Amino acid sequence: MKAIIVGGGIGGLVTALMLHERGIACEVYEQADAIRELGVGINTLPHAIAELKRLGLLERLDAAAIRTYELFYLNRFGQEIWREPRGLDAGYEVPQFSIHRGRLQGVIRDAVIERLGADAVRTGCRLGDFRQDEGGVTAWFFDRLGSHVATTRGDVLVGADGIHSSVRAALVPNEGPPCWNGLMLWRGATEWPAFLTGRSMIVAGGLSAKMVVYPIAEGSRPDRKLTNWAVVARAGEGGAPPEKEDWSRPGRREELTPHVARFAIPHVDVEALIAATPELWEYPMCDRDPLPRWSQGRVTLLGDAAHPMYPVGSNGASQAILDARCLADALVRAEHPMAALHAYEAERLPKTAEIVHANRKGGPEGVIDAVEALAPDGFADIDAVLPHAEREAIVRGYAQKAGFAKEQVKAA
């Protein structure tokens, strides 16, 4: 059996490792001219780290990332709404990692090249067309100037090519642009003095704007960390996104400044942190409505191509990794490739659709919104505003939906 993987992001590369581990041949085609370590920080949750541990990547990730120790939810005045340990410190058998997105992709890319060979990943290859027949699927690839560069044939084709997936567009030709909720997201990372434990994550704000801050790598000195931050705030009424959503549009600091003025985070000088950041990026916060199906014949979708979701709850990359494991297992177990794709879809589509809808409601960060709605001017006693059991239901309920509650995660 052979799989054609369209997209060399985290989901596509992990899929290649999963398939190789199970003895299934595969090729990865990426439209960018090179797989560069771009982006800013992300969190990778224990259920996904357990899968990467099974692939033998834990030591490499540990060297590149921060083991997240704790998470705080604060209101816009910096008052504590919720606090919980994370990863190993919460009793999981594997860590939660905060890491630079590009570094995570780089670790996985290096493993693919080492195990499958340099020819397993072809860059500068845009999918032009694919066609299925009774015996397999054929795909044609072109460079950015439109010249044909490759034709390949396999038993299945996996679209892991992101929110602007060309594979998804071929399967669902009249879907239209992604859904924008009217929120803009600004992100950046810079070296900064360590705060709290040096492994802490803070989410603060209210209904109109929120900010997240956490370290993603060691700094030049023990008391400094490469620190990731993100601010999300309303910029419109929603609908079609104002510009193409990607990770490479420079942010405008003057648009961010009024929103930052709303925050008071006791442990971090937010304005100074952002001012010290050499480059910042912005994009409209978008997702897509869940599809009724991902697979048609020998072709299926994975990761953001299948279920793009708002970046709350630290779930985007983690869910792509879970997709990869499920798809690889299905291809091994099923008697026919199409049966495998249907089994994969039946397992993963309902779960990810639920997360997409949960993220639209704010995900676990909805606990901040719930408290602000009840106490917009702050509080003297959080339990008098929203009892512990109700706050726990919001946060833990999301963990259950997303599959990373402690009892759900089984480490290798």
Residue ranges with predicted function:
Residues 64, 120, 262-279, 337-342, ...:
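Acidic/histidine metal-binding catalytic segments
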Residues 1, 21, 78, 292, ...:
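C-terminal helical "tail/cap" subdomain of flavin- and related membrane-associated enzymes
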Residues 195, 215-220, 224-225, 233-313, ...:
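FAD/FMN-dependent oxidoreductases across multiple families
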